[in-house]
A protein has these predicted regions:
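Transmembrane alpha-helical segments and their cytosolic interface motifs
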Residues: 183-202
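Soluble catalytic domains of membrane acyltransferases
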Residues: 1-140, 146, 151-152, 194, ...
Length: 279
């Protein structure tokens, strides 16, 4: 699978959510430098991919990863990589790098291989809980592609494959997505939104402080917000359960605890609605 890359970790989650089946992903190799991070990433089925700008000595390490990718494909598990080699929070597509062609051609020498162009379009790149569309295009038959170009030099095969893949991905990316406006009923639910904001305040405030002060690349913001939700929600749930059960009757504390489970998402949905009304 070959999606465009605009929203860091969120792009991989979109692919997983759309397919709902196991996949292995490629990610830039520099995030594997920490041994603990590398172990965690490999546990999540993410493999390191070096880029030309990382230096030729680093690119050699890709051949080790290629062997792992071969093993993944041999077992019938899809491999997903972002062929641009980096992310950009803009509509469109950066130049396709050589890595996707190297992997596809190498795999085609051993088995029937397809590359699936994938388009990901966000309603807003920086708003958490914004809309998103993921579209899978017609697979490119790599074996047929190579048979039709047997007489061409390798460099031309690479160039034509990258050009074809770029065209196929761009066909799937909506360059002017329609804003999906939320219902005006949100005004009536304003008190509920306030309650959700207060219940989840330690999570979203921590996330927003880190996003505003500690992250230079805003494209990582939504990934950070998601990670804060995943790691802090269980902790805060225990805290609220203790506080509410000691201070309120059960018939009031139970609904508040249930509301807390959805409060983080409700808070950001409300922010999205406010942004949407101003747009």
């Amino acid at each position: 699978m070959a999606p465009n890359h605009t929203n860091t970790l969120m792009d991989a989650l979109v692919v997983l959510q759309t397919r709902r089946s196991p996949s292995v992903f490629g990610a830039r190799a520099d995030i594997f430098r920490n041994p603990k991070a590398a172990a965690a990433l490999r546990f999540l089925r993410i493999l390191p991919m070096t880029r030309e700008r990382d230096g030729l000595h680093s690119v050699v390490d890709n051949y080790k990863t290629f062997d792992e990718i071969d093993s993944v494909l041999e077992h019938g598990v899809p491999f997903c990589m972002f062929p641009e080699g980096r992310h950009r929070a803009e509509r469109g597509l950066l130049p396709i790098q050589k890595g996707i062609a190297r992997i596809a051609f190498r795999s085609a020498a051993e088995r029937q291989t397809y590359v699936v162009p994938t388009g990901i379009t966000y309603g807003d790149f920086f708003l958490y809980r914004s809309t998103c569309d993921g579209v899978f295009g017609k697979p490119i038959d790599v074996n047929a592609f190579l048979r039709e170009r047997e007489e061409l030099p390798e460099a031309k095969k690479y160039a034509q494959f990258r050009e074809l893949l770029s065209e196929r991905i761009l066909e799937l990316v909506d360059m002017s997505p329609k804003v999906k406006r939320l219902s005006f009923w949100w005004i009536l639910l304003f008190p509920l939104w306030i309650a959700a904001a207060l219940l989840s305040l330690p999570i979203w405030l921590s996330a927003e402080l880190l996003c505003s002060r500690g992250i230079k690349d805003k494209a990582f913001g939504n990934s950070v917000r998601l990670l804060f939700k995943l790691f802090l929600t269980p902790i805060l749930l225990l805290v609220w359960a203790l506080v509410l059960c000691l201070t309120l009757p059960w018939w009031l504390s139970l609904p508040l605890l249930i509301l807390f489970l959805f409060s983080y998402s409700l808070f950001y949905d409300g922010l999205y609605w406010l942004h949407d009304r101003r747009a």
